[in-house]
Amino acid sequence: MNQALQNNTDKNIVLLKKRALYYLGKREYSRNELLQKIGPFAESLEITRQQVDQTLSELEEKDWLSDKRFVDQFVFSKKKKFGLKKMGYELKMRGVDEIIIHDALNKIKSEEYDLAKNI
């Protein structure tokens, strides 16, 4: 009986991982965004938060999930529409680490400074 329960849990974790990879195949997500996206699905499969966190950590270890890559893509797509403060706020609301946000925004500042200097 216990073995059957373990097999069912393992199958559910595989389903959760497939769902996460499906979303990541469409676009980059921050860890927090992906957690919000797959959270209800995990609950319906009766997967614990700890198991979800382990799954997300595994995706990060395999470099399929990356907050830095998400930030780089976000900044690239929004830098013509948003200012630095707006981008910083949006990234913070998406649960991205402050250090990653700070590094990305500093990179933009230095690029803008170099462009202005060359004009």
Functional labels for PLM-detected ranges:
Residues 1-119:
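An alpha-helical, amphipathic repeat domain used for nucleic-acid recognition
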